[in-house]
């Protein structure tokens, strides 16, 4: 069965055992595309890679908390928590600065 989703409804995307899943506020959908294929298509829509196996919708993050070791802990709108690895934390912090600059203009 195929579903048409509005990308704004997606909280995050992750991969488990080479299977890709899209998480909305209420439902989880399996997707035939690989994570890197989705990442390429969603780059300009505020989706950011947060680890080897996950991409988040920046607009659906409720809070961001720094953790030991340079990681970040994200709490999504539905209360689920995801870690941003050190490798991807730099891009997340840059996105935050970009948003702050646009607000202060």
What does each of the following model-derived ranges do?
Residues 1-77, 81-83:
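Conserved binding/recognition cores within well-folded domains
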Residues 90-91:
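C-terminal structural segments of small proteins and small subunits
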Residues 94-105:
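Short, charged, intrinsically disordered terminal tails
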């Amino acid at each position: 069965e195929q579903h048409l989703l509005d990308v704004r409804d997606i909280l995050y995307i992750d991969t488990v055992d080479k299977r890709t899943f899209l998480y909305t506020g209420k439902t989880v959908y399996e997707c035939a595309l690989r994570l890197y294929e989705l990442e390429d298509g969603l780059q300009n829509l505020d989706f950011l890679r947060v680890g080897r196996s996950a991409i988040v919708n920046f607009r659906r993050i409720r809070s961001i908390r720094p953790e030991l070791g340079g990681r970040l802990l994200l709490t999504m709108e539905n209360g689920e928590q995801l870690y941003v690895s050190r490798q991807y934390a730099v891009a997340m912090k840059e996105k935050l600065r970009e948003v702050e600059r646009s607000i202060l203009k």
